[in-house]
Amino acid sequence: MKMKKLHKVLLAIVLAWVVGVAEAQNVSPVDFMRFNPYQINANPATDLPYESVMSILIGNFNLGMQNTSLRYDNLFEFDEQGRPALINLRQFANSVKKDNYLGFNASVDLFTLFRRTKHGLLTINWGVKTQGDARLNDGLFKLLGYGNGAFVGEGNPAVVDMSLNVTGYQELAVGYQMNVTEKLSLGWRGKLLFGAANVTTDAFNAQLTTDADSYALRIREHIAMKASLPSVFYIDESGYPATQGYFRVLDLFKNPGFGVDLAAEYRFNEQFSAVAAVTDLGFIHWRLNNFDLTSNINDAGQFYDHGDFLYNGIGVDQLQLITNDEDYREKFLDSLKLYFPLEFGQMGKYNTMLNTNLLLRANYDVTPCNRFSIQAQGRFMGSGFRPALTLAYCGSFWNNVNVCATYTMMPHSYDNIGLGFSWMMATCNVYLTTNNLIGFFKPLNSSSINAQVGIVFNLWMPERRFIDESGKPEYLE
């Protein structure tokens, strides 16, 4: 019964990762497309060529994943027909990096409205988001590939270290963009945040040491996680998570938070411009249905030794009982579980930070309709700082077509060739982009896959603006 309850909790953690948008280290061609209103997400100071914009539900869909080094082709040996024939854990262990990063993102913007005022552009946006990432070191893969025989001696432990950070929330953003002078533009957005779910690891590590003389196994582990999940989950009298079977929508608004986006854009002349931006600077205060999970080696009998699990082997008689007596085997396995307890408990309020993003960009306009850009970007994730360097070209044709090509370099990821296309038809802008064309042909062997599509409506036509010969946005006649 307890295992069934635990499975439900694990399922909830996975769902919290999958639902919404994970703002991982994704650089999208949308960020550079001058006709796409959603470029303002990366640069709130940009002067959009529109009088007004609106979208409901269909404005922005985003799907993607990040995987620095875990590759399908490295896990298997293949037959002559190219089908997996054998799992090769040692080959897989040799292929991973010292630190491996995984992420997933899927997004929907529920409502967007931009409206130009006398002095600038008012922006309103409501969306559902998650920010999620996981980090795994190579210790677990080395242990599976080579066994404990590769870790003999006190100075040579197998170290398994992992971290997981997932946050699901709603975001209501209100902002303003203004042209301070002909050369300087500023932009900001204030964000009201409403947390839906959070899972964070403070510690998730283990050490396994093999004695050089007796080959006894010594295991030390420490797990500390905290979570805030919807009210459908609670800790029952046995100390395990359980479900109530119903969900209260109002709970989605009981974990408040706040964030800001800030940006400045400066045009040196008609060719050169520069952008600096800080986005997703904020926090969420978790106060509803919080609990923690901890695990340390427990003193449950003969295998406990000064805080460690020490396994010296078992006798022949005991081995025969384990092999032949089902009841004895179940009791023996249950006794081993007592050494590795999972303890759940209610906990107080806590805060988590958003994954703040820093951006520096330089633009060179060859002509008013052809722009080259170079961008340095970095995001502070729960598992560390994730930098990226992007080269981009964006062309505007016939005043209604945008084509954008990007190349992005990230740690352990150098094959990210992106392409974006948008077409403005009367009162709507249809766009389709990806940050990695190669990834669509080899999804299980790519470090990054992303697709972003949407339809945005340009209201109050014919007041839509365009880029004139001087490179400045102007109204259509």
Kindly label every feature range from the protein language model.
Residues 98-102, 135-168, 228-234, 406-477:
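Outer-membrane beta-barrel translocator/channel fold
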Residues 23-130, 134:
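N-terminal, post-signal peptide beta-strand-biased segments of exported outer-membrane/organellar beta-barrel
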Residues 38-40, 104-109, 166-172, 256-260, ...:
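Residues that define the transmembrane beta-barrel architecture of outer-membrane proteins
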Residues 33-38, 352-356, 365, 371, ...:
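Solvent-exposed loop/turn segments connecting transmembrane beta-strands
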Residues 44-46, 106-115, 124, 172-178, ...:
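Residues on the lipid-exposed face of transmembrane beta-strands in outer-membrane beta-barrel proteins
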Residues 65-69, 132-137, 195-201, 211-212, ...:
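Outer-membrane beta-barrel proteins
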Residues 52-54, 120-122, 183-186, 271-274, ...:
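Repeated loop/turn-to-beta-strand initiation elements of outer-membrane beta-barrel proteins
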Residues 54-67, 124-130, 188-194, 221-232, ...:
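Transmembrane beta-barrel strands of outer-membrane/channel proteins
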